[in-house]
């Protein structure tokens, strides 16, 4: 649910502040928030320096991969509605199944495989254009989001492996370091640095308050998801997380009806049917996977 809220906040920020700017600037704000969290984690968990350099490098790589996935996701969100982008996160569990099978030894039952197939069908169905552009597949959207899901699955796998071997907050600390490194590299690019500083000067109060709230919501969802990885198989956690699509769709309808200035989704009869069918397919798939 927190991630669904964050998706709509991301869309609002993209529409209001980043329509003509590179969405990579939004990733800089994410990096800023996690860097500010580092000393707090270090204070409460002094053992963060205990892992070997090799372990630290791999955990930091998970953070870099996470930010790379976020960049693909934001580029997709810049040109599509939130409820159209979100279903593609459902491809994540399938990547998670494969990775967990080969790396962690997790196996899939026939029911889980059927559920995974329904999730994919739902994600693909919502990406089809109808009407004037009937049956035109949104290739760019699919490429961005499938790549995003694969990268996120690899990042989650690395996090789980080390969180089980080391410690949750220590692993989180070094993953945040990797996210901070990614943001630092972006900030070193002159064009991104200029856009970042310009946005801060022209929209300081609104941008910082909304973005900070969004990043805290996203951080809460991310930490909850990562902690769940310690309690359940990777594929199961990702499948349950795929319910984000249903919440995104529901919140999108509420916003369009009651708060259209904040976010607007297409509410034509066919669009509602298409998104509704996709949501049902995804929900059925999740139910089969988690049963």
What are these model-derived regions, one by one?
Residues 42, 47-72, 89, 139-150, ...:
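Loop-to-transmembrane-helix transition segments
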């Amino acid at each position: 649910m927190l991630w669904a809220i964050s998706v709509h906040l991301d869309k609002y920020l993209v529409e209001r502040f980043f329509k003509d700017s590179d969405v990579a600037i939004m990733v800089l704000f994410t990096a800023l928030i996690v860097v500010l969290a580092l000393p707090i984690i270090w204070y409460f968990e002094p053992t963060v320096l205990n892992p070997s350099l090799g372990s630290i490098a791999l955990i930091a790589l998970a953070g870099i991969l996470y930010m790379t996935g976020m960049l693909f996701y934001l580029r997709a969100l810049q040109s599509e509605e939130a409820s159209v982008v979100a279903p593609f996160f459902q491809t994540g569990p399938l990547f998670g199944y494969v990775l967990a099978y080969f790396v962690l030894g997790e196996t899939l039952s026939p029911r889980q495989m059927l559920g995974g197939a329904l999730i994919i069908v739902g994600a693909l169905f919502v990406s089809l254009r109808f009407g004037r552009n009937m049956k035109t597949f949104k290739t760019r959207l699919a490429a961005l989001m499938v790549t995003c899901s694969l990268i996120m699955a690899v990042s989650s796998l690395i996090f789980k492996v080390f969180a089980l071997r080391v410690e949750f907050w220590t692993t989180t600390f070094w993953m945040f370091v990797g996210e901070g490194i990614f943001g630092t590299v972006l900030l070193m690019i002159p064009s991104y640095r200029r856009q970042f500083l310009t946005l801060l000067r022209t929209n300081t109060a609104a941008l910082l308050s909304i973005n900070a709230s969004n990043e805290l919501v996203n951080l809460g969802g991310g930490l909850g998801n990562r902690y769940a990885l310690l309690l359940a198989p990777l594929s199961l956690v990702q499948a349950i997380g795929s319910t984000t699509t249903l919440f995104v769709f529901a919140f999108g309808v509420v916003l369009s009806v009651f708060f259209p200035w904040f976010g607007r989704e297409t509410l034509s009869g066919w669009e509602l049917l298409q998104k509704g069918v996709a949501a049902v397919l995804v929900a059925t798939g999740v139910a089969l996977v988690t049963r």
